[in-house]
Amino acid sequence: MIVEVELGFLLSTLFFTIISIILFYFFINNKNNLIDQCQEVTKLNNKDNKIVNNNNNNYNNNNFNKIEEINDDKNKEIIKLINNSNNKNLKIKIQEIDSGNNNNNNNNNNNNNNNNLNKNSNEIFRNFKIFSGSLLVIDQDLNIISSSESVRDIFSNINDINGVNQQVIGSLQNYSFINLVHQKDKDRVSTFLKLKFKNNNNIKHQQFSEDIINEKDELKEIQIEDNKELIIINNNNNNNNDNVLKFGNNNSNNSSIILFQGVYHLNNTDLSKPFNLQVSILPFISENYIVLSLKDLSPPPLRLLLNKTSSALSPRSLSSSSSSSPSSSNNNGNTNNSGSLSPRSSNSNGSAVSPRNVSSNSMSPRGQNSDRSISSPRGSSSSSSSSSNELAISPRNSNGTISSPRTSNLSIESVLNNKSIDMISHLSHELRTPIHSVIASIQLFRSTILTVTQNEYLSIIDTSANTLLELVSNVLDYKRIRSGKLTLNNVDFNLCHVIEDVCAMVSPQAQAKSLQIASFIFIHCPLSFYGDPIRLRQVLLNLIGNGLKYTNKGQVCISVEPEQVNEHCMYLHFQVKDSGIGIKEENMSKLFAGFSQVNNGGTTQEALGSGLGLAISKDLVELMGGKIWCSSNATQNNGEAGCTFHFVIPLETNPKQLPCPIQNFNGLSVLVVDKNPYIQTVLCQYLEGWNCQVIKSSDIKEASNKLKDLRREQIEVVMIDIDNIDFRDFIQFKDAFNRLEFGRIGLITMSSDRSMVNEMGFGTSKLTKPFRQSHLVACLLASMPEHSSSTTNCFSNIVGMNSNINNNNNINNNSNNNNNNMQTHNSNSVYGNGNYGNCTPFSNNNNRIHMMSSGDKPSINNRRMSISLGKIPTFNSGGSNSPRSKKLFEEVLQQQQLQQQLQQQLQQQQQLQQQQQQQQQQQQQQQQQLQQQQQQLNTIDDDSNNYCNTTGTMDSIDEINKNNYSDSESDELNDDQAPIIAPVQQLSFGRVTRRHSIDIIMFENSRELSELRNLEDSTRYLSPRSMNNNNGNNDNGINGGSGNSLFGSSIKEEIGGTSDTSSLAQSPNSLSPRAPTKIMILDDNPVSLKLMQRILESRGFECYPFDCSEKAVAQLDQVNPAIIFMDCEMPKMNGFECTQLIRKREQESLCLLKDRKIIIALTAHINPEIQVKCFDAGMNDFISKPFKPQCLELILRKWEDCISNNQLNYNNSLINNQTTIQEQV
């Protein structure tokens, strides 16, 4: 029942997450509709504004554009427009309208009328409705007299419109409105405007009936028939001056709106490029002047829409009184509504809306005065160009003049991109939080007992959640790259590991489609490069993922070759080649465009995705200073389809690093059987580069014939891919190989399915594809035949040699020895430049002469010796007389002597065991007393299951000795009789299922592999010295105290074994019990808080969850946690402020550095700026949601020393308490 409830909880959480994503896409795709809705007409209130129609009660507005109610701010704008006119007469006459009415009223009306008309001039326009747009006043010569500030949102030459340039040069000529009209429409617009002036002269104001006028003689608005304008009349105002702007009706049947094409658009880099404009004649009636309302009909760019939308909907808006009406969209920057849809606001003095104020630097992450560095994908073309501290976001500079359209366009683009990034980043944070809850719940759910159907449902939920997370991350990365806010790291990394980890990550996806994955890195690849491995991995994953989507049969291969090598830099050429459908030539231009997918005509589009992978890859490669392109074979008819993505990037190298090691197998003859020619080519390239003689075969029957026809000495190792072969043929080959060639030729079986390799139970070594270089080398070493000329036969020969070796005689003189008839073979040794020196194998080119007779028993297996040494050959040998060869012989002799010492120690241990049996009774009594004392004092419990005791070790050594020196052994060692020189296998080769074979482990992802590598570095292997002076009752760990490690018990589990402990925190200590580590969790999201608590408690930690930072700080001293997981986004006091408060308290209390709390940031943000902010606040580490439990364990493992320090303090306090109790007793 509980399982079903939890499953229902998961499904409901995923449902709400999917709904959020759908709403997010609906919001992005319908932003144009959102802007249009924001510009809807604001209807007049019938109580305040009464509309009268002579014919009917319907408000017919067919001849008008979208109109808006004039508020006080718009009244001020019109008054300012007219008063700021350069025409002195116009300005005077307008003032006469405001004050001259009083004079007329004094002569014709009583004092009551004076009180009604002696009002603020804004009342003239109170009930008046105008067209939304930018206002212009022109005279009869069509010259611009005055303009509103909102004209700046349309035209780039605002200085010419306002007459600024004319005043500078001393000219008195006004700027003609016709200059703003495109050449083909100038005559039509000019005729239209002049006709309007002519019609204004024939207007008669006495045409309205007295019945329409209200008794109060105030301003009223009247709507009359179609094709007639809106008018406002004042019965008491009879001023007939022609220079006065009056309100009246135009009796002309001509429309008052005209559409045409204009020039000098703000968003056009080409000033002569036309754009659509609409001009409406406002009902200001004058003989000499006309007021025009202009509206830009050109489609606004997407970035402008995103900016407007984010300004209206962002929770971080500058003002809570923001308006979404069209009146604020054309704001000139002088109003108090700072949160409007206008790209300018009053808080920035007319500059575009920005998350920073005017005094901050440029929106570029490098500041405004810095040069364009490698972090910009656009190069120097988008560099900041301003010497002042103002943002380069407005077409006006600090002097009020207009910059060039191209410069202003780039500046606006930068600001709008940054604003849209803030919006998407906020949405990304809100989406990643529920996704984290889904993924964490899945991990907890999988730890319970589930049915097959439930596991299937969980897999679907897990896949959907990860796809959702990938989509959100891609959208955010795309916007950050395009805005230039993404920076690259420059760290040391291993290129080979990065590429092989990528292949391992996409291997399950390829295996689901029965595709092959392979990678080839050039042989002389340096071990170390400097660059950003995370972004390089992202590019490779995108390209490989694209190849897997469009490939149904075949393979996807990666290759890396050097293109240009400099002293401190190397240009590497990456190729990702697939065998898919290919890309047509006409679709190449659309390939790297964002939010697009290419469809090759008749090919069915089965691959789905956001269309951002290739666009992000292109930007990242350009950000690294490289280039990317694609070549395709889709148009060829030779059967070779598919495409290849190329990109070249420079990577810095370390000139002080050692030369790259090169494996040398001394002409080892290898038969490669693989039906896939591409995978076979990759294998052959590696083998030939490692000095192997390669024989190719594409059919297993052909391989069997070659084994029969060729001499046995000419084929030493067979590599066979069992994925693409017939099962019957493989069974026949297996039977023939076991009957004829077993023990003489090594066999490596390869498969993409690990379970298939294990079920076969056939072969000397097993290799899982996609293979790694280190795994391939290990399999070759393990599969070499016992007496191959390519192996280090010197090891086996040393055992049977006489005293010539002990006397350090020259090996070349062995040709005169009757027992050793050998010749020196001066070829490349399989061992070179290792810690064990160079070794030269001795053999004859025609006859392989072995030193051991049929009755000799080899005490050392060559293959096991090569594995135990842990060194792979690198450079060529210097010959049999080289000091390294002699040193190698001495090392082997020391190994033999050490083994003899082990045998003597075994005999001594047997004697000690007999003595121990006589003392058992005394020891039992002592143990009973000790157990009673331990129970009383709550001392340490014995946990012998997690440690190897001496008796068990001696038994294993007895078994090894028995296998090594049994009289019933034959010349050729069987699988169960192979002697081992090292008691513990190397972790890098994984778990060995058969003593005569090596089983290569392919990890699921790179994180597990990196964790294992960290464990290998910190692990001390079992050595013979650790067995000295240990008896059967010793409870101390034989690994030299590694049991004190917090995560020591998980090493065995990481490499494929089982661990007795179920959690990291429950790892036993050899000296004291493990104290549960206290962890405090701060998160305002109850779902995330509960899941985090469940994950940590399941691993044995003691958790203290808090949903409020104030409560957590108040109980901090009482709880005294070792680790604090801090959510950055919390109400009241956020995570940054809480961390600063904790650090301040620690400083005031003079807390030592080792005693400070470990604070780990827990947030859904993935921006580098947030990480820097976390570290600046005093946090120790950073983990981004959603995360997997393995990632959490890795974070905790990094702070193992601090946790151990707290554990030591706990142990000391426990010992002190026990001492006090004992003294009291």
Curated annotation (Swiss-Prot):
Annotated Low complexity bias: 313-356, 370-388, 1023-1037
Main location group: membrane
Modified sites of kind Phosphohistidine: H429
Residue intervals passing through the bilayer: 8-28
Record flagged with keyword Acyltransferase: no
GO process annotations (BP): positive regulation of chemotaxis to cAMP by DIF-2; response to ammonium ion; signal transduction involved in cellular response to ammonium ion; sorocarp development; spore germination
Entries under SUPFAM superfamilies matching the protein: ATPase domain of HSP90 chaperone/DNA topoisomerase II/histidine kinase, beta-sandwich domain of Sec23/24, CheY-like, Homodimeric domain of signal transducing histidine kinase
EC number: 2.7.13.3
4-aspartylphosphate sites (modified residues): D721, D1127
Topology in membrane: Single-pass membrane protein
Stretches assigned to the Histidine kinase domain: 426-653
Molecular function terms from GO: ATP binding; phosphorelay sensor kinase activity
Single GO cellular component term: membrane
Domain Response regulatory: 669-784, 1078-1200
InterPro entries in alphabetical order: CheY-like_superfamily, HATPase_C_sf, His_kinase_dom, HisK_dim/P_dom, HisK_dim/P_sf, Sig_transdc_His_kin-like_C, Sig_transdc_resp-reg_receiver
Ranges of biased composition (kind: Polar residues): 357-368, 389-407, 945-954, 1058-1072
Key word tRNA processing present: no
Region (Disordered), start-end ranges: 313-407, 809-832, 941-974, 1021-1076
Family matches, as CDD domains: HATPase_EvgS-ArcB-TorS-like, HisKA, REC_hyHK_CKI1_RcsC-like
Keywords assigned: ATP-binding, Kinase, Membrane, Nucleotide-binding, Phosphoprotein, Receptor, Repeat, Transducer, Transferase, Transmembrane, Transmembrane helix, Two-component regulatory system
Catalytic activities: ATP + protein L-histidine = ADP + protein N-phospho-L-histidine
Subcellular location: Membrane
Function according to Swiss-Prot or TrEMBL: Acts in a signal transduction pathway that regulates the slug versus culmination choice. Believed to be the first component of a phosphorelay that couples the sensing of ammonia to the modulation of PKA activity and hence activates culmination and spore germination. Ammonium transporters amtA and amtC are thought to respectively activate and inhibit dhkC phosphorelay. This protein probably undergoes an ATP-dependent autophosphorylation at conserved His residue in the kinase core, and a phosphoryl group is then transferred to a conserved aspartate residue in the receiver domain.
Record protein name field: Hybrid signal transduction histidine kinase C
Taxon lineage: Eukaryota, Amoebozoa, Evosea, Eumycetozoa, Dictyostelia
